Structures are given as C-alpha cells and as structure tokens.
Regions:
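Non-transmembrane, aqueous-exposed alpha-helical and coiled segments at domain scale
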Residues: 3-170
C-alpha cells in the first residue's frame, strides 16, 4: 500500500550543486558525458552540475536516516551508452576500507568501485520491465542488494510515459 511506504527518489548516477564533498565526482570525459546526456545544468543559471558515479555508501545512509522503504530511480537512460558502469560500494580512508558513511567526509575519501557491464541499448522507447536489457536488470538488482531496498519504479526518459513500474517482490 502506498500509504505504508516511504519513497526515495534517486538518479542512476550522482550530481551535486555547489561546493562541498563529492567522493565520486568525475573530472574527466566520463563526467562531461554524464553531464551532457543528463542535461545537468542549472535551470536558471545554466551552471554545470557536478556529476559522478552513484555513491551507494551515501545513498544507503540516506535511506536509513529517512526510513525509505522503496526507491524510484530516475535518468536510467543517461547511462545507456556506457561500456562499464561504476558504483561506489566503500571508501578508503587513510588506507583503510570502510563501507559506512563516516562522520567527517570533508577530505580524504577515496571511492572503492564495483564495475558492472553497461547495457549499450537505447531504453527510451521501452514501455515495460520485460524489455529491459539483461545488463540493466543486473545493475538494478545489484543496487537493490547493496541498498537492501527495492527499486519499484525506473524512468527511461524525461516524459511521463517513460516511467516504468517494476514488478518486484516485497
């Protein structure tokens, strides 16, 4: 029942506006590609948003503190053209690997990534979960397992009709 659920909305990758810590920020062509494909520019100022791979450590912490029971993943289609998709599953701090969100994230966090195969498929025309490529399903399953939270809805484009409900078990 929707009234018994707390939905968390996330992107298939991470963005940040303004300064501050962003462990998975990409300063290379990959970051630029995500920014361009995701139209990650400020609506008023046109300022570039900072882009990076999904940070599952930070997301898991956010899910916990907000009591999220189900997730909605937006902008899945932005990752359609990548050979490899990365997801931060831990951080290295002073040479030690940790899988929790530390008290002080101001500096010294190095992301530890899991790499998954990209789906290299245009998902924008898909209308049901049955059409999703195997690699995309593997990415979603990986995220669900890492986050211990089901992803119930995914978007495969900016239009309302490009929002697909998944038939996951609760």
């Amino acid at each position: 029942c929707i009234r018994d659920s707390v939905y968390g909305i996330m992107k298939a990758y991470c963005t940040r506006v303004g300064s501050g810590p962003f462990p998975t920020e990409l300063f290379d062509e990959t970051g630029k590609k995500i920014r361009d494909l995701g139209h990650e520019y400020g609506a008023v100022t046109g300022r570039e948003r900072r882009c990076g791979w999904i940070d599952l450590v930070a997301l898991k912490y956010s899910i916990m503190v907000n009591g999220v029971t189900q997730l909605i993943m937006m902008k899945s289609d932005v990752l359609d053209d990548f050979e490899t998709i990365k997801a931060c599953v831990a951080y290295k701090v002073n040479g030690e690997e940790i899988d929790y969100f530390p008290y002080d994230i101001s500096e010294g966090l190095e992301p530890v990534y899991a790499e998954l195969p990209g789906w290299k498929t245009d998902m924008t025309k898909m209308t049901s979960e049955d059409e999703f490529p195997e690699e995309f399903n593997a990415y979603v399953t990986f995220l669900e397992e890492q986050l211990e939270t089901p992803i119930k809805i995914v978007s495969v484009g900016p239009d309302r009709g490009q929002t697909i409900e998944r038939y996951t078990e609760e």
